[in-house]
Amino acid sequence: MIRKCTEHGYFRGGSCLQCKRPGRYLLDDNKEEKLGRFVSGTLRHFPESAGVTMDRFGWVNINDFCDVMRKRYSWMRKEYLYALVESDEKGRYEIRNSRIRARYGHSVNIDLDYRESDSPYLYYGASPEEVDVLLENGIFPIKQRYVHLSTSYEKAVEVALIHTENPVILQIDAFKAQEDGISLKLATDDIVLAERIPPEYLFVVEE
């Protein structure tokens, strides 16, 4: 559910996290999920099939995008798209100058115009079965365009637990990798993107 607080903006749930007021109702869980799936799919995976034009950096005109969504969902309003983006705690999307894009998770080929990460170390969670292969061959993207790295050990554990019960966390020597010419782009406060990470920069974090 998405609602809007007059003082603190859009939020998800029954009450504003800051002032605890209920705010104005906008979207129920069902509509929120439908919009979220379509926005994610279009901006990350199938813009052409959805009928929108995406530039090389992943941007889509927000008015054109809303027109496409209205054809699919008659109840769609432009405000709902802003509400979906601004209430998203994971920072999956950004809106700028009447354009919208996904910040990470792409399978379509886009260029990254983010700033370089300044974290000396980054982290990647893997299953015990994957670790030896990664240490030998490095980390490559599988279903996505870029490798997704975490800026903290804790976040890497959180992400890895989605896929495995006993994650092994790899530490990446980001400073050395960047010195050697590997680009590490900061997508959000928690996520850094890379084309690949060669094995010489990987180390297992001992518990």
UniProtKB/Swiss-Prot annotation:
Protein name (record) = Probable RNA 2'-phosphotransferase
Q: Does the keyword Transferase apply?
A: yes
Query: Which positions are tagged coiled coil?
Result: none
Q: List the disulfide bonds.
A: none
Single Gene Ontology MF annotation:
NAD+ poly-ADP-ribosyltransferase activity
Which SUPFAM superfamilies does the entry mention? ADP-ribosylation (SSF56399)
Protein keywords = NAD, Transferase
Function as written in the Swiss-Prot or TrEMBL entry: Removes the 2'-phosphate from RNA via an intermediate in which the phosphate is ADP-ribosylated by NAD followed by a presumed transesterification to release the RNA and generate ADP-ribose 1''-2''-cyclic phosphate (APPR>P). May function as an ADP-ribosylase.
Task: Please give the family membership noted in the entry.
Answer: Belongs to the KptA/TPT1 family.
What EC identifiers does the entry list? 2.7.1.-
The biological processes this protein is annotated with in GO are:
tRNA splicing, via endonucleolytic cleavage and ligation
Q: State the superkingdom.
A: Archaea
InterPro entries recorded: Ptrans_KptA/Tpt1, RNA_2'-PTrans_C, RNA_2'-PTrans_KptA, RNA_2'-PTrans_N
Species whose genome carries this gene: Methanosarcina barkeri (strain Fusaro / DSM 804)
Q: Which Pfam families match?
A: PTS_2-RNA
